[in-house]
Amino acid sequence: MRRHAIILAAGKGTRMKSKKYKVLHEVAGKPMVEHVLESVKGSGVDQVVTIVGHGAESVKGHLGERSLYSFQEEQLGTAHAVQMAKSHLEDKEGTTIVVCGDTPLITKETLETLIAHHEDANAQATVLSASIQQPYGYGRIVRNASGRLERIVEEKDATQAEKDINEISSGIFAFNNKTLFEKLTQVKNDNAQGEYYLPDVLSLILNDGGIVEVYRTNDVEEIMGVNDRVMLSQAEKAMQRRTNHYHMLNGVTIIDPDSTYIGPDVTIGSDTVIEPGVRINGRTEIGEDVVIGQYSEINNSTIENGACIQQSVVNDASVGANTKVGPFAQLRPGAQLGADVKVGNFVEIKKADLKDGAKVSHLSYIGDAVIGERTNIGCGTITVNYDGENKFKTIVGKDSFVGCNVNLVAPVTIGDDVLVAAGSTITDDVPNDSLAVARARQTTKEGYRK
């Protein structure tokens, strides 16, 4: 059976009090609507139509060709929004799910189960519901004496008795597609809001003797919509908790989950330890037996087995097996560290390749460079890679020793097994097996201060 989805993403989001389009506010580093799209796609849907309005081009820019789009010029209610997908879906057979673009916590598993329940019951419509302690603001599920759905009533149209009901509509539905578009034309706006409500489609189906099901989820967090910054922070916290829980169940030690942020696209191997205050974002891959020290930040990087990152920042970089970074080091984009490398305190590496066993232990800047195997870079060494207009490369061979407080003025190549004396400013290439000294000779005048 063909399956389709409509994502409702046309609302203004005035309560966000933001210049940014509502569904583009981020949870766990991704726009809310992107989380929804990924869950919808993961549930086995063949075609997605996103209903856009305010900020349409921004939404299209984020989702790209993963969705079709329909424009809702006036926001006249959820049924009106769904009807905007008519040109794409009206003639389609199969099941269509309708999901709100501001529900970033909905999972593909719940959508899969909703669809399965709907199709197994041969229903014309199914609503995803939940029971919550504070149902204010949600449509209520009104059941008849036999426990079947009688109608869904919106908060502003509900009687006090209906407001006391704690089973609510999530705003997520599954429909027989043909039935959906047939009934949408019959929906009226004679309600307190003067809007065309999508739940009225269910009442129309019931009035015709059709089958309408309710599937109740036990995970209330999943259906939480985000309408303001407070709810945005709650969704962020819930996503953080879910992600950390997943990693811990898969063998990762997270010492303080409440202070640890791990993005949804991060992968972490078993027996890795994440200390408090850590942030790991983007498409980061972390191996096994790694230690990520407290207050480290890692973005879009690869950390191989056995590495240790101590209170450092790693951006768009790779760290080899058993390599130690920090404390207080910064790996900038293009930093590539081999195995058993040491990058110590207050060292900055940018667009540089440090081969296996290389050491840069303290207070250095290494940029646009290649450092050979087992080479030691002394404290305070700087690659002078920029002349104000262009960047130049520094190459240091294997098994070399560069003393403290050395300036390597690029472009320059230092060979293998070279010793560069402390305090030197190297401007010329140095061949293999050489000693390079480039500093003024010391002059001492005894008794000068008497």
From Swiss-Prot:
Chain intervals for the UniProt region annotation (Linker): 230-250
Record has Lipid biosynthesis as a keyword: no
Provide the catalytic activity annotation. Answer: alpha-D-glucosamine 1-phosphate + acetyl-CoA = N-acetyl-alpha-D-glucosamine 1-phosphate + CoA + H(+); N-acetyl-alpha-D-glucosamine 1-phosphate + UTP + H(+) = UDP-N-acetyl-alpha-D-glucosamine + diphosphate
Keywords, A to Z, come to:
Acyltransferase, Cell shape, Cell wall biogenesis/degradation, Cytoplasm, Magnesium, Metal-binding, Multifunctional enzyme, Nucleotidyltransferase, Peptidoglycan synthesis, Repeat, Transferase
Q: Name one GO molecular function term.
A: glucosamine-1-phosphate N-acetyltransferase activity
Q: Pathway, per UniProt?
A: Nucleotide-sugar biosynthesis; UDP-N-acetyl-alpha-D-glucosamine biosynthesis; N-acetyl-alpha-D-glucosamine 1-phosphate from alpha-D-glucosamine 6-phosphate (route II): step 2/2; Nucleotide-sugar biosynthesis; UDP-N-acetyl-alpha-D-glucosamine biosynthesis; UDP-N-acetyl-alpha-D-glucosamine from N-acetyl-alpha-D-glucosamine 1-phosphate: step 1/1; Bacterial outer membrane biogenesis; LPS lipid A biosynthesis
* Cofactor binding note of this UniProt entry: Binds 1 Mg(2+) ion per subunit.
Q: Where does acetyl-CoA bind?
A: N385, Y386, A422, R439
Which top-level group of life is the source organism from? Bacteria
UniProt-listed GO biological process terms: cell morphogenesis; cell wall organization; lipid A biosynthetic process; peptidoglycan biosynthetic process; regulation of cell shape; UDP-N-acetylglucosamine biosynthetic process
Q: What is its EC number?
A: 2.7.7.23, 2.3.1.157
Q: Where is the active site?
A: H362 (proton acceptor)
Q: Which PANTHER family match?
A: BIFUNCTIONAL PROTEIN GLMU, NUCLEOTIDYL TRANSFERASE
Family the entry assigns? In the N-terminal section; belongs to the N-acetylglucosamine-1-phosphate uridyltransferase family. In the C-terminal section; belongs to the transferase hexapeptide repeat family.
Protein name, per record: Bifunctional protein GlmU
Species this protein is from: Staphylococcus aureus (strain USA300)
